[in-house]
């Protein structure tokens, strides 16, 4: 259970984030996209990393857009007032056009919103805790020290549900989303191989998480995922592999080392302490 660390890792000066050399340059590059997106609180971002296929190790040449994810701490007036800002989404492709390889997506969550999703076992939210290419603030380092608070067996139905959605997308039993289908992929390979890759990726992640309490990023089976994504497997083969992995995840859950449910009071304390310490630091640095 989290009991607070007296500000260790949180009360430090945030400007520059203590990064050096090329790490600082890469952080500045990512922050530039956040500013280009006209996010109103770039100095409140406590965690920022490149997600998507690059995070998982399944990127194929220059076919993917750039996905930037992050967490921010809102100013007190947004948290305590009437107008909140739980998340921020922006894309160079806008709301209608499908993304191309030159596009950039920025997805940011408030700390409270991210923690709420992570408590539910949301796969995207849990990736934030394991992103190896991340640039972090002292506040986020505190969360990494207590990441096990967010790792429970409640993640299993979330991962399996996301994987099933991708499987249905692959087989054509589910809508393709507001930005439309991927006709060029289906025409080339005969089915949606990107959805196939995501199906297997989610299942491998789920199995590892409930068995070992971690998610390795990039994925150890990234070469296999790339082969799936480039059409080296038939759809029937992918369905068979997915079926075996679904069963493996259920078996792993039955023997899981993870607790069955979230310690919500501990998470609430960690989140509340982080907000207070961040705001206090901002006051001190004025």
PLM features: residue spans?
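Acidic, Ala/Val/Gly-enriched low-complexity intrinsically disordered segments
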Residues: 5-8, 12-15
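Helical scaffold of the NTase/Pol beta-like nucleotidyltransferase catalytic core
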Residues: 14, 18-50
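Active-site nucleotide-donor binding segment shared across nucleotidyl transfer reactions
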Residues: 35-83
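Structured mid-to-C-terminal alpha-helical surface segments
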Residues: 43, 153-170, 210, 214-286
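Generic structural signal for hydrophobic core residues of well-folded globular domains
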Residues: 72, 118, 203-206, 210, ...
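Glycine/small-residue-rich interface belts in oligomeric ring/scaffold proteins
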Residues: 74-98
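Conserved NTP/Mg2+-binding pocket subregion across the NTase superfamily
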Residues: 91-198, 203-206, 217
